[in-house]
């Protein structure tokens, strides 16, 4: 498996680093059939639907030409292209999750190469859509004139674009296969590492089982008595510690209660002393105020009696 993985990576890198100018694509005869697209992954099935629709467009039948004058063909192709690229991204994300155990450098390089192949496929689709839109504009501009030359030129462009689309799709398919091979190898490596980690634990479990079997050969009554004595000793020790703690807590509570009563008595005496002191301060002042008030009332009464006129004096006046 590792040898296959290395061979695939070397082949892929050699194809990426080659800087040879692409050869001109040979003209395909009108009656010559191009190879079919095959695949079982969701993105391959989506691309197959796009491939079949493009083959129907390439026939340039009367129905195709009629729909080319509208936007229906462009809309259908756009929907199929978006579906294909969506499935490619989903499949790539799934492989990236499986590729996590592989080295970071290798994973980054493969991801970059895969993105480049994916971008080329998207460019081919965009060129195809632009070519059809350009043809529609040219036909609409030549209404009432013969369009045989435009149709033949479109057929030639479609054959070339379809061939380039197939080439880039196969390239993407190969890179995804390399990506998947790396994911499988990473998964196998993770399983091996997990097996190495679990090996000592399994051995310890086996030894523990053997020890338990040896202990099981002893008489059950002896083991029960030994466990009972240990449990009794532990319970007695716990009870003794609990009793000591209760005695200490009782003593502490008595000390706290005595201190509280003492402080309460001191506060009561201080309050009584302060009350008596306040009374001694204010009692003379209150008595003096009472005397002054009584004298003031008496003077007011005398003034009132002295200023009241007699009846005879009032009459003479």
Swiss-Prot record:
A molecular-function term among this protein's GO annotations: phospholipid binding
Localization in the cell: Secreted; Secreted, Extracellular space; Secreted, Extracellular space, Extracellular matrix; Extracellular vesicle
GO cellular component: chylomicron; extracellular exosome; extracellular matrix; extracellular space; high-density lipoprotein particle; intermediate-density lipoprotein particle; low-density lipoprotein particle; multivesicular body, internal vesicle
Modified residues (Methionine sulfoxide): 142
Region listing for Specificity for association with VLDL, in residue ranges: 277-289
Pfam families: Apolipoprotein
Region forming the signal peptide: 1-18
Region (LDL and other lipoprotein receptors binding): 157-167
Domain of life, source organism: Eukaryota
Region spans: 8 X 22 AA approximate tandem repeats: 79-254
Glycan-bearing residues: 211, 310
GO biological process, one term: cholesterol efflux
Sequence repeat start and end residues: 79-100, 101-122, 123-144, 145-166, 167-188, 189-210, 211-232, 233-254
List of residues binding heparin: 161-164, 228-235
Keywords recorded for this protein, A-Z: Chylomicron, Endosome, Extracellular matrix, Glycoprotein, HDL, Heparin-binding, Lipid transport, Lipid-binding, Oxidation, Phosphoprotein, Repeat, Secreted, Signal, Transport, VLDL
This protein's record includes keyword Transcription: no
Location of region: Homooligomerization: 265-317
Posttranslational mods: APOE exists as multiple glycosylated and sialylated glycoforms within cells and in plasma. The extent of glycosylation and sialylation are tissue and context specific. Glycated in plasma VLDL.
Region (Lipid-binding and lipoprotein association): 209-289
The family this protein is said to belong to: Belongs to the apolipoprotein A1/A4/E family.
Functional description taken from the UniProt entry: APOE is an apolipoprotein, a protein associating with lipid particles, that mainly functions in lipoprotein-mediated lipid transport between organs via the plasma and interstitial fluids. APOE is a core component of plasma lipoproteins and is involved in their production, conversion and clearance. Apolipoproteins are amphipathic molecules that interact both with lipids of the lipoprotein particle core and the aqueous environment of the plasma.
Oligomeric form and interacting partners: Homotetramer. May interact with ABCA1; functionally associated with ABCA1 in the biogenesis of HDLs. May interact with APP/A4 amyloid-beta peptide; the interaction is extremely stable in vitro but its physiological significance is unclear. May interact with MAPT. May interact with MAP2. In the cerebrospinal fluid, interacts with secreted SORL1. Interacts with PMEL; this allows the loading of PMEL luminal fragment on ILVs to induce fibril nucleation.
Name the UniProt record assigns to this protein: Apolipoprotein E
Annotated organism of origin: Camelus dromedarius
Organism placement in taxonomy: Eukaryota, Metazoa, Chordata, Craniata, Vertebrata
């Amino acid at each position: 498996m590792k040898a296959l993985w290395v061979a695939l990576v070397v082949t892929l890198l050699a194809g990426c680093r080659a800087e040879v100018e692409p050869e001109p694509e040979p003209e395909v005869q009108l009656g010559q059939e191009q190879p079919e697209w095959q695949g079982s992954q969701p993105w391959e099935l989506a691309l197959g639907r796009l491939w079949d629709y493009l083959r129907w467009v390439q026939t340039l039948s009367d129905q195709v030409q009629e729909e080319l004058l509208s936007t229906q063909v462009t809309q259908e192709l756009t929907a199929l292209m978006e579906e294909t690229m969506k499935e490619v991204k989903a499949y790539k994300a799934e492989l990236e999750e499986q590729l996590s155990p592989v080295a970071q450098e290798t994973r980054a390089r493969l991801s970059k190469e895969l993105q480049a192949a994916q971008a080329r496929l998207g460019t081919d689709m965009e060129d195809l859509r632009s070519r059809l839109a350009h043809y529609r504009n040219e036909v609409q501009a030549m209404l009432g004139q013969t369009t045989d030359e435009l149709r033949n030129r479109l057929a030639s462009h479609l054959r070339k674009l379809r061939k380039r689309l197939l080439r880039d799709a196969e390239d993407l398919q190969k890179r995804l296969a390399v990506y998947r091979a790396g994911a499988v190898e990473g998964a196998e490596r993770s399983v091996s590492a997990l097996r190495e980690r679990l090996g000592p634990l399994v051995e310890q479990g086996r030894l523990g089982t053997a020890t338990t079997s040896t202990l099981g050969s002893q008489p059950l009554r002896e083991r029960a008595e030994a466990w009972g004595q240990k449990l009794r000793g532990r319970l007695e020790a716990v009870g003794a510690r609990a009793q000591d703690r209760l005695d200490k807590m009782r003593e502490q509570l008595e000390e706290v209660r005595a201190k509280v009563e003492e402080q309460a008595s001191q506060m009561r005496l201080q309050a009584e002393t302060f009350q008596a002191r306040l009374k001694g301060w204010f009692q003379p002042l209150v008595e003096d105020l009472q005397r002054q008030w009584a004298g003031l009332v008496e003077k007011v009464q005398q003034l009132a009696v002295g200023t009241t006129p007699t009846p005879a004096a009032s009459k003479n006046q």
